[in-house]
A protein has these predicted regions:
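Acidic/polar, glycine-enriched structural segments that form the non-catalytic walls/loops
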Residues: 9-224, 241-245, 252-258
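Short, well-ordered beta-strand segments enriched in hydrophobic/aromatic residues
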Residues: 2-10
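Aromatic-rich carbohydrate-recognition surfaces in CAZymes
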Residues: 10, 115-119, 138-163, 221-352
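Mature, folded catalytic cores of secreted/periplasmic enzymes
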Residues: 6, 49, 330-332
Length: 352
């Protein structure tokens, strides 16, 4: 859930029927080629939420690089919310009337309307399932215990002021810490923070263990890559070192599986959002066990279940691996996490 804050400063009296509005196009529901989209409006606790989604959701259906999801529900929440079409938008602009009955095949929008001079809108995305993790379908961390996107929006609305205060307090702390380094470092750190946090998804496996999984954009779309985690860790070493453990946990888990029959750390866990086994450095052989298993340059696609294969499968080309880099990354991350105060249990479990 995200906030869009606004305040109106009129150059005179506002008309009695003034409003502030925000809208989203149906393109948020699919990747590339236009698809059938449906939607509606939810009456909630003191506000409304309009939503739309692909008519046929294909959850976690694409592991290609640099793509938008072909699944999930997109929301706008405001005092009043609408699902409208092109024709409905034109009618609203020309005559001030809202058509809440879009026709089939019309291009859809969701619209939020407030009638206060100062306020905020909420936009939200419910991916329904966030990560496939070696046989487990995992939801976003907030949804543990049966919570829904409605709970997330209700919470974000009820705790709006408190959340913004926490953000302001953290921002002040970050600014103070960055001032020790030098002028301009705070601006750089703000950009790095947004990139690092935005690149990761937080989920929890069936054992109750945290997983903080990155997506490696413009580099095969790999998930949980050790050499992406490594440059991401400074922020979390400072403010939440347990998230560094959560970055490493997947590498440890996959390294113990029979298909990974090496004594060094793997590079990745698959391609986002599928943790189904490392995809980097696979062996291309012209035999019946390998030929046709891997395709390059094809999109959309989903991963094969490499993690279930026995050691004899010989899936990987050892000449394409990075043992020094990945082991170095993991050793430094684990030592740094412990030094920063993370739970030592993960290290004890994996370095007996």
């Amino acid at each position: 859930v995200c906030y869009t804050e606004y305040e109106i400063f009129p150059e005179g009296e506002l008309p009695a029927d003034f409003s502030a509005a925000i809208s989203l196009d149906e393109e948020f529901c699919y990747n590339g080629e236009r698809a059938w989209v449906v939607g509606g409006v939810l009456p909630l606790k003191g506000y409304e939420a309009a939503y739309f989604t692909r008519g046929r959701n294909m959850v976690l259906s694409d592991t290609s690089d640099c793509v938008a999801p072909d699944w999930g529900d997109v929301y706008i929440a405001a005092e009043e919310s609408w699902l409208v079409s092109d024709a409905g938008v034109n009618l609203d602009v020309s005559e001030g009337k809202t058509d809440y009955n879009p026709k089939d095949c019309e291009r859809l929008y969701i619209l939020g309307v407030n009638r206060s001079k100062k306020g905020y809108f909420m936009t939200a995305f419910d991916d329904k399932v966030s990560i496939f993790y070696f046989g487990e379908w995992l939801k976003c961390y907030f949804f543990e215990g049966g919570k829904t996107i409605v709970d997330a929006m209700d919470f974000s609305r009820a705790e709006h002021d408190s959340i913004l205060k926490q953000c302001a307090d953290f921002d002040a702390k970050l600014k103070e810490d960055c001032a020790k380094v030098g002028e301009g470092y705070y601006t750089l750190a703000c950009a790095a923070l947004r990139q690092s946090v935005g690149a990761h998804k937080l989920v929890q496996n069936s054992k109750g263990e945290l997983l903080f999984l990155s997506k490696e954009n413009n580099s095969n779309g790999c998930i949980g890559t050790a050499d992406v985690s490594y440059p991401s860790i400074p922020l979390y070493l400072l403010y939440n070192p347990e998230l560094v453990n959560a970055m490493m946990r997947g590498i440890y888990d996959f390294a113990k599986m029979p298909v990974w029959n090496y004594d060094f750390a793997p590079h990745d866990l698959g391609t986002y959002p599928w943790c189904a086994g490392q995809v980097y450095g696979t062996a291309y052989r012209e035999d019946k066990y390998c030929c046709g298993m891997f395709s390059t340059g094809v999109s959309p696609r989903t991963n094969q279940m490499l993690y279930i294969r026995p050691a004899e499968s010989d899936v990987y080309d050892v000449n394409c691996q990075m043992p020094v880099e990945e082991c170095g990354n993991m050793l430094v991350m684990q030592a740094a996490a412990i030094a920063a105060g993370a739970d030592r249990g993960l290290a004890r479990k994996n370095f007996p």
